[in-house]
Amino acid sequence: GDVYKRQMIECFKIQLLALPLKVSPFDVRESYVLKRITGLSEWFCLNPTIIVADPFLFVDKDRLYLFYESKRLLTPGVIMMTSTIDLKHWTKPLVVLKEKFHLSFPWVFTDAGKVYMVPETGTDGSIRVYEATDDTLTRWKLKRKLIELPPGNVMNMGYSDSSIYKKDGIYYLMTTVQYEDDINTLELYYSDSLMGKYVKHPLSPIVHSQNVGRNAGSLQKINGKLYRFSQNCVFRYGDNVHVSEITRLTTTEYQEHLVKENIYSSEIPFYNEGGHQFNMVKFKEQWIVATDAKEYHYLLYARIMNKLKRFLMCFRFPDFG
């Protein structure tokens, strides 16, 4: 039950799926499993990897790249990458981006012939864009902070799961924040250039909802239709993924409607506890879909380390906790 889960550590794992192009990429029941990545392999490690999540796929020439968040129990998340040319043999996963603060949601894209990444950097109070500095996509440099938290503007959660969609020469940026009510609030900005000044859309916030207010991947155009994936957070964080079709997107208009709820079927054991990411590409004449899923583990030493960390914080800062 829920009481038992509160005594456990919430973890995430990744699963890559393949589907025929004739099948809807939203129907994971028609897929077969390509690859899985899990944490918790270092059973005797004091700082084990507990989260591998937020997978994003990116195709460059004949190579498929998988970027994802990897987080250990006591340290902030970093961005890792692995790649393949045949879907069978994958390169050794490498840390490609690390900061002093938490990183996740590594959305990778191209613009004007260059490769960029917009990871989640909300704990820094900003939305950042990094540029790849080599052809292997293993090195990245900060190019610009697109948006920064205004002075004195207090959010309970700032700038999460951000991505950009270019349409008719305009760059539309979506990001999720939470204000005093702790409800997921989807904000929309736009600019006439990737590195330009982003102004808030007149209809922003465009969504205020625990059901569809937080993105679960980037916007994707499939068979001529533009889709947005969102997390179901009604009962708990990252419970499942919904799909909405965006029917109007201009500098003055925005419309979307829900087309599919709960992509992850509870009939599939891997997704028993839900998931919060959905991303796809066409590669080798099929759909390749990146998903993640939640799981819970009772790690005694992890609970001890958490309590020790809290004790040390209280000792150093008497008012803590």
Which stretches of residues belong to each language-model region?
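Short, small-residue-biased leader/transition segments that mark boundaries at the very start
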Residues: G1-Y4
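Structural motif
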Residues: I9-P25, L74-T82, D124-E131, D181-Y190, ...
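Predominantly five- to eight-bladed beta-propeller fold
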Residues: C11-L17, S244-P269, M305-P318
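Surface loop/turn signatures of beta-propeller and other carbohydrate-active proteins
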Residues: Q15-F58, L73-L74, K88-T110, P119, ...
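Hydrophobic core segments of beta-strands in well-ordered, beta-rich domains
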Residues: P55-K71, W107-T123, R128-Y130, L146, ...
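Short loop/turn segments that connect beta-strands within beta-propeller blades
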Residues: T84-K88, T133-L137, D192-M195, T247-L249
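Loop/turn-rich, solvent-exposed surfaces of beta-rich toroidal or solenoidal domains
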Residues: I170-S191, N211-I246
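Blade-level signature of beta-propeller repeat domains, shared across WD40, Kelch, NHL, RCC1
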Residues: F235, N240-L249, I268-L312
